[in-house]
């Protein structure tokens, strides 16, 4: 669910997810649409595509189990749907961490109407 995603992002990046990524670029957070602005925004685009690939799942509300061991996210024993949701969230948290150097404050609250049509997943 969103709380677990935000928690993973905080653990991996040290950034509070909602204010840092909630309106970032064209693909992070609310109203995501459009060609990614940078590598950070691309992480969110890939995450959105990961969620889209989940059929019969509710990734924004489902609750899965995971742990934080030795600074590593470990998805727990979940049903297949929950396992994949956890893996999607883990991947975006790691991607955001790996691209912290591309984080651009100018994209933190980016006007979505300026976003061009996105690539297909």
UniProtKB/Swiss-Prot annotation:
Keywords: Cytolysis, Disulfide bond, Myotoxin, Secreted, Toxin. Gene3D superfamilies: Phospholipase A2 domain. GO terms for cellular component: extracellular region. GO terms for molecular function: calcium ion binding; calcium-dependent phospholipase A2 activity; phospholipid binding; toxin activity. Disulfide bonds join 26-115, 28-44, 43-95, 49-121, 50-88, 57-81, 75-86. It is found in: Secreted. SUPFAM superfamilies: Phospholipase A2, PLA2. One of its GO terms (biological process) is arachidonate secretion. The keyword Disulfide bond applies. Expressed by the venom gland. Homodimer. Belongs to the phospholipase A2 family. Group II subfamily. K49 sub-subfamily. Snake venom phospholipase A2 homolog that lacks enzymatic activity, but has myotoxic and cytolytic activities. This is Basic phospholipase A2 homolog. It comes from Metlapilcoatlus nummifer. The lineage of its organism: Eukaryota, Metazoa, Chordata, Craniata, Vertebrata.
